[in-house]
């Protein structure tokens, strides 16, 4: 059995279980878009006290290097992705570990499971979060993520920010700049399907597809809700390119 040291410098203090789940779902959706495969299966399996969450994508499968890289060049260069693969993956694992929530990842390379272990080369007893690699447990295609002992409320909080996992939206117009929706949930702002804000002064909801540099710079590791100033010009661009009888 092999071990991979995640080399996590710090754990996001204000991230909760739902935030970690959200990041893993975002990565699965990104893989669906990048590999042009079927949309991921996201299924909560109810237990007696707690539930387990299965996130299954049909892409290229998670590899050892994904756990030690800091950022995915492929994702950085793509305008349609929403996760922070590398940094976001490590953050999610660390947060789940801190909350004593078990998670495992299975692909064609094996099953990857986080554990706490003595750091090699350190004589002071320092322990770090490392990944065990069991090459005897594999699947043929994609990645299966199993998250054990989570509550329904954490699951519902996590999926609430994904447009593709929500109901009550009627698409009114679409352009390369983004989509306009009439929504039962008020006016919400999405970026490539991930919620980044709400705005009570807007009539419709918007999904931005081509963020400008100002919005890109406003995005942060913590995924905090953004101000209107950061996305206003993007909304104007969507409206200008989508004017029809509905809007």
UniProtKB/Swiss-Prot annotation:
Pfam families: HATPase_c_3
SUPFAM superfamilies for this protein: ATPase domain of HSP90 chaperone/DNA topoisomerase II/histidine kinase
InterPro entries xref list: HATPase_C_sf
Family the entry assigns: To M.pneumoniae MPN_635 N-terminal region.
Taxonomic source organism: Mycoplasma pneumoniae (strain ATCC 29342 / M129 / Subtype 1) (Mycoplasmoides pneumoniae)
Name the UniProt record assigns to this protein: Uncharacterized protein MPN_633
């Amino acid at each position: 059995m092999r071990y991979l040291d995640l080399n996590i410098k710090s754990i996001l203090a204000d991230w909760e279980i739902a935030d970690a789940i959200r990041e893993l779902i975002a990565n699965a959706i990104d893989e669906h878009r990048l590999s042009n495969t079927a949309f991921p299966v996201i299924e909560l399996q109810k237990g007696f006290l707690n539930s387990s969450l299965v996130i299954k994508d049909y892409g290229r499968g998670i590899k050892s290097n994904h756990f030690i890289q800091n950022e995915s060049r492929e994702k950085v260069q793509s305008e349609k992705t929403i996760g922070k693969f590398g940094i976001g993956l490590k953050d999610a694992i660390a947060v789940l570990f801190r909350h004593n929530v078990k998670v495992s990842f299975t692909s064609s390379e094996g099953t990857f499971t986080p554990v706490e272990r003595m750091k090699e080369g350190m004589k002071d007893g320092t322990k770090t979060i490392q990944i065990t690699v069991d090459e005897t447990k594999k699947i043929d295609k994609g990645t299966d993520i199993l998250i054990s002992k989570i509550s329904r409320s954490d699951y519902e909080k996590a999926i609430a920010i994904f447009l593709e996992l929500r109901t009550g939206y009627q698409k009114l117009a679409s352009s390369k700049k983004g989509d306009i929706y009439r929504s039962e949930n008020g006016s919400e702002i999405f970026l490539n399907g991930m919620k980044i804000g709400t705005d009570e002064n807007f009539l419709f909801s918007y999904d931005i597809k081509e963020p400008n540099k100002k919005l890109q710079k406003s995005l942060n590791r913590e995924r905090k809700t953004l101000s209107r100033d950061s996305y206003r010009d993007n909304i104007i661009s969507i409206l200008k390119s989508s004017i029809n009888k509905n809007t």
